[in-house]
């Protein structure tokens, strides 16, 4: 005959086995950005604001139109961050000739806080290629 203590022990063991056998709750996939988002960035004393409009292109892909600096850019979800890497051009501040640049942009899939880095691909004036032209922290906020 099993006493009260035996029943409690058996109950505890069954509960433990059940808990161990239960798979962890799956985390929901981050929301794919869609529609307009407010973009704000602080770079030294200057602040920048714009609207980025996202169009999903898959479960881990979204394209953005964001003023002249970032058009038709595809972001891909990687390790909890939306990431984009591409090329563009800007005027060399020394002689005002077109200067090819690389752009690396990423933001956290949950907080929407991100970083943007632009670097030169060719020399500009006396500066070497590969110099960082700008690095900004930014925040996206879903509009509407």
Regions found by a protein language model. Give the residues of each.
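Extracytoplasmic/secretory-pathway segments with low complexity and glycosylation-like composition
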Residues: 2-3, 30, 42-45, 89-95, ...
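Edge beta-strand at a domain terminus
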Residues: 118-144
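N-terminal glycine/threonine-rich, aromatic-flanked beta-hairpin/loop signature
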Residues: 45-83, 118-119, 123
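Tryptophan-anchored aromatic micro-motifs
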Residues: 30-50, 112-117, 136, 140-142
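Contiguous, well-ordered beta-strand patches that form the walls/edges
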Residues: 67-111, 144
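Short, hydrophobic/aromatic-rich segments at coil-to-beta transitions
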Residues: 30-39, 58-64, 78-87, 110-113
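Secretory targeting and sorting signals
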Residues: 1-28
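Amphipathic hydrophobic-ligand
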Residues: 47, 93-102, 130-137
